[in-house]
């Protein structure tokens, strides 16, 4: 993906406007991963129409730095929205409920109760299907 110079300038203007303050060109989260060229050298290379690969490398380093700053701003904004609307607590409670339901269905799905039917017969609540309670079967001697 190639980002041209006007796009990089628009991104930098957006980042400066969104943050409300001017960030130093050498600072940032991606300062260690930045190309060995500093922005002044990149501007000189672009102005002098130097080597095409160096110019592309400079544009790439500048745009990656701007995208990293933009990503940090977006993640900050999302965190603030989550905190103000209280969405983080609801997601945590829903995850616990889903895990319990999944365990219950896995228990039924893999046939864990089949051997129980063979050993013990039907469970208490299954007698209700036939219209009589378990104690009625025991009391009147019917099976």
Swiss-Prot record:
Q: Which InterPro entries match?
A: FMRFamid-related_peptide-like, FMRFamide-related_np
- Name where it mostly resides: secreted
Q: Which residues form the signal peptide?
A: 1-20
The annotated phenotype of a deletion mutant is: Defective forward locomotion whereby sustained long foraging forward movements are replaced with shortened forward runs, more frequent pauses and reversals.
Gene Ontology cellular-component terms for this entry are: axon; extracellular region; perikaryon
Entry function: FMRFamides and FMRFamide-like peptides are neuropeptides. KHEYLRF-amide has an excitatory effect on dissected pharyngeal myogenic muscle system. Functions in RID peptidergic neurons to promote forward locomotory behavior.
Q: What name goes with this protein? A: FMRFamide-like neuropeptides 14
Source organism of the structure: Caenorhabditis elegans
Q: Encoded by which gene?
A: flp-14
């Amino acid at each position: 993906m190639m980002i041209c110079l006007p796009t990089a300038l628009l991104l930098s203007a957006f980042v400066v406007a969104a943050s409300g303050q001017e960030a130093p060109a050498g600072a940032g989260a991606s300062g260690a991963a930045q190309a060995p060229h500093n922005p002044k050298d990149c501007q000189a290379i672009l102005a002098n129409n130097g080597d095409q690969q160096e110019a592309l490398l400079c544009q790439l380093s500048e745009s990656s730095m701007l995208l990293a700053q933009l990503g940090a701003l977006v993640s900050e904004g999302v965190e603030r929205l989550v905190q103000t609307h209280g969405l983080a607590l609801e997601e945590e409670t829903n995850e616990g409920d889903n895990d319990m339901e999944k365990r219950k269905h896995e228990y039924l799905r893999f046939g864990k109760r089949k051997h129980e039917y063979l050993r013990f017969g039907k469970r208490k609540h299954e007698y209700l299907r036939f219209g009589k309670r378990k104690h009625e079967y025991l009391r009147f001697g019917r099976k």
